[in-house]
């Protein structure tokens, strides 16, 4: 299984792809590889984020899932991986998504791709590693729950991810406030 996110990956893109990676490897006997452009080192605390490939490959996957991509071109240099896969899927939350891939799951009501993924998978199979990554995705696309896309659903899901092991203060401090403090020095 290949996973690809959008160009210039943000916290939701990284959190969603790493969350899905951890969900798949902990529940299914599948080989999985994430493909993303370079991203903020602040996100490397996520379990297995260091295994992400930043280089395209010629490998043909049985399945490639585009995560947090409003259209297929948003995969940038990793689009050929998606196009050459035997089967394709898109998981997204952008209302502008035209629907691409054999299977396309777009939840325009979701605050983030992380929330859309949470709703798509079996929640009782989400482990601590996946919970931390998905929580980071929600936190980033809601601006630490300040943006107008912060909904009751997003807050409820964030609460469930905390129960599954996500550490909110660590994730927020590592990816928001640590950066802000250093920038203000």
Regions inferred by a protein language model and the residue ranges of each:
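Anionic-ligand anchoring segments at beta-strand to alpha-helix junctions in alpha/beta enzyme folds, i.e.
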Residues: 2-59
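Short, glycine/acidic-enriched loop or turn micro-motifs at the edges of active sites
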Residues: 9, 13, 69-71, 95, ...
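Hydrophobic/aromatic residues located in beta-strands of well-ordered beta-sheets
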Residues: 32-34, 88, 134
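Divalent metal-coordination and catalytic microenvironments
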Residues: 10, 20, 43, 65, ...
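A structured phosphate/pyrophosphate-recognition subdomain
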Residues: 1, 7, 19-25, 98-185
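Generic beta-sheet signal
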Residues: 35-37, 67, 91-93, 108, ...
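Active-site cofactor/cluster-binding pocket
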Residues: 47-49, 53-103
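Conserved strand-to-helix beginnings and helix N-cap segments that scaffold or border functional pockets
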Residues: 13-18, 76-78, 151
């Amino acid at each position: 299984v290949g996973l690809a996110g959008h160009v210039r990956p943000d916290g939701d893109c990284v959190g969603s792809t790493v969350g899905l990676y951890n969900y798949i490897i902990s529940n299914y006997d599948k080989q999985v590889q994430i493909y993303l452009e370079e991203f903020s080192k602040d996100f490397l605390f996520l379990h297995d984020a260091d295994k992400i490939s930043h280089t395209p490959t010629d490998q043909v996957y049985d399945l490639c899932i585009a995560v947090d991509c409003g259209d297929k071109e948003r995969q940038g240099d990793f689009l050929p991986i998606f196009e050459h896969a035997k089967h394709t899927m898109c998981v997204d939350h952008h209302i502008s998504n035209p629907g691409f891939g054999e299977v396309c799951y777009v939840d325009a009501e979701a605050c983030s791709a992380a929330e859309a993924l949470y709703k798509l998978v079996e929640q009782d199979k989400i482990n601590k590693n996946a919970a931390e990554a998905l929580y980071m995705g929600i936190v980033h696309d809601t601006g630490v729950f300040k943006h107008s896309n912060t909904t009751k659903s997003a807050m409820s899901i964030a609460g469930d991810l905390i129960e599954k092991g996500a550490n909110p203060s660590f994730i927020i401090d590592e990816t928001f406030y640590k950066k802000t403090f250093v920038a203000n020095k």
